[in-house]
Amino acid sequence: MQTIARAYLAGQPFSSPQLLEHFLPPYHEGVISAWLKEYLPPGAWVLDPLGSTPFPALEAARSGYRVLVASNNPILTLLLEVLAAAPPERELQAVLAELASSRRLDERLEIHVQSLYQTECPACNARIQADGFIWDREQAKPVLKLIQCPVCGAQDEYPLSAADEERVTPPGRMELHRARAIERISSPDSPLHAGAVEAMQMYQPRALYIVSTIINRIEGLNLPESRRKLLWTLALTMLDAGTSLWGWPEERNRPRQLSIPPRFRESNLWMVLEQAVRNWPRSEKPVFITRWPNLPPEEGGICVFPGRLREWLPLPRGIQPLGAITVVPRPNQAFWTLSAVWAGWLWGREAVLPLKGTLERRRYDWQWHAGALHHTLSILRRNSAAEMPIFLICPELVPGFYSAVAAAASAAGYLQTGQALCADAETAQLVLQGGADVPSPASQVGENLARTGVEEVIKLRNEPTPYLLLHAAALAALARGGGIPFNKPEIAWDTLTKLQNLVGRVFNKSESLIRFGSQAQASESGWWWLAQESGQDEPPLADRVEMEIIRLLIRQGGTPRSEIETIVYDKYPGWLTPDTAWLDACLDSYAEADERGTWRLRQAEQPANRRQDLLQVGEQLAVLADKLGLVVQGENPWEWRLKDGTLIFRFYGLASSMLARYILAEEEEVEFQRVIILPGSRAKLATLKLHRDMRLQQMAAGWHFLKFRHLRTLAERANINMDLWNMLLDADPISGDPQQPRMLF
């Protein structure tokens, strides 16, 4: 089978926050449904063998497919079942109100918990609740409180008062609270005990007391199972926010290790519960969901198997998936360990057993990850038709992650029959299908395979290419040529090391590649180009994408962003997948979006208007040449010559940022000055292109860039002379940073 370059499916990010989203692998809506529509008929059985996130199954079921999900993590099972139920906000409000009114001794639970966050507003002395507290890890205590005063409007960080410091320690003996929390996870003589004790360090005393108290109250409520699940899910938001993992100042936290940052936020956990109700993900309609062996209807739904795939397969006759979909997560010791802890707190020690390995293991490397993924894929390979397609989404991609996926898939007997990789989105989308045995090449042959794969992709793109994409290209070439162990019962302990060394030699010891960009000496970074020019006639990929977007905007008029992405990614699939940042930059440069997100070409960018602009450029250059006593010749490029015929300036007029056709075509060392003249609206795009393509940047080192408006200003100056021209030529740079005028002669 041959790998087919597939169009990258961009999808759409969620419009609102999702539960546990900082732990779950990133997911865009629309990707799974688009893939299923192409590969499988509606109503078909589809399998998610990992169940790493609830969203693929939900999307597939809403698209009319029957989805089988193997879910070994009870926390993710709960999340999937509750999101499928799509409870309205009023139900969430009702169960939270019932929890709030439950009693702790002689007071309402809500009042008791809120009293632990009580503080005084430093601005007006009103007694209010703090939004949270900022802890210092070294001092092992809170040092600031976060206030949004509902009385006077004060909103800031403030030092703690003496009363605030007293409330840090909750009622009762903290040692007893902590011991009881650990006991719900494991017994003292259990091999899981040390991991449970270590995980407890993620909760400060007040947070641990509150989560324990609230979970006890949930257990004491007489609720039907559906409402109890709602409370458990709300409690998850509290358990999540209650850890010490959330650094301060706030940033894009995606913790993977149980490591407390130097400063972290302790949130007001009752406020967290209230916010969870307000921010609950809204969905159009519930999804039919059941647990095995009960099955969903033909019109679509989800069947969850709460266990490992090996305990489930083979499936009975009549229930044979026609395809598989899954999001491959990166190893996440923090989430996996906390899932075991939360499962124990919510449901007791039995619920911890499926995740017991997470309390025993502290670190996960890529070799471990490859082995775990190989185990799952091998089970799937033995229990499904060879031609059954598997769609893998691999977000947060790094070289080691891709190596693990490639090694696992090959060793399980799968070939890549489709691929797309978006480098700046750090996401690969792979289609796997079972294949016949591939012969293993000799080591030197394998190195040549990888090098050829890298060079072919660079030539295909015809521009310096980021390492991540080339690393994947090397491994894909190895997999096609038998350079990765294929159809093996297990992955050898040194497989990834050997692959890394082989690919490393391609980049470190190759005379055919040169590296741009990163200051680091490691090869796994920067942008790579060919030591010898590619000789390709195609423009650089960035120019091709820019031209496609221009044509699209001219041809179609108003176009939604999603449609633009689909057209561009269809045109440039596989290794040609453009960066999302470049698509954004092109749209911002040429077009504007209305309130509905429809993009239209700006009036100034209409072809007729830009042709007129370039005609005016020629006229303005002629006016300037006359004032400077020079002779103008040619038409785009225009040349300025001295009376004796000596060429001193050559000007290139552009309405786009497609610089390569001029800059790369010129000799590097010339005796005259070269100037690109372009619209001011193209300045940011041209600057970004020079930043991305350092080969182009190097070649452009002696060039000048002149905006239309600046040329017009210079042409209108009555007192212009050669010295003044030389001083002002670079006074309005495309980078937007004013420069000191410099002399050219």
Please name every model-derived segment.
Residues M1-S52, P56-L322, P329, Q333-R362, ...:
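Nucleic-acid modification enzymes, centered on SAM-dependent nucleic-acid methyltransferases
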Residues L315, G323-T326, N332-S339, F391-I393, ...:
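Extended hydrophobic-aromatic, low-complexity segments
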Residues L415-F745:
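C-terminal non-catalytic scaffold/interaction domains in large multidomain proteins
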Residues E91-L99, W347-G348, G400-L421:
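Conserved Class I S-adenosyl-L-methionine
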Residues I111-A123, T358-T417:
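Conserved Class I SAM-dependent methyltransferase catalytic core
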Residues P306-L309, V328, C394-E396, A420-L421, ...:
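Active-site proximal loops enriched in glycine and acidic residues that flank catalytic Cys/His/Asp
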Residues A34-P41, H374-A385, A660-R674:
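Short, basic/hydrophobic alpha-helical segments
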Residues F23, G348, T358-G371, C394-G400, ...:
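Short, contiguous acidic/charged loop-to-helix segments that flank catalytic cores in large enzymes
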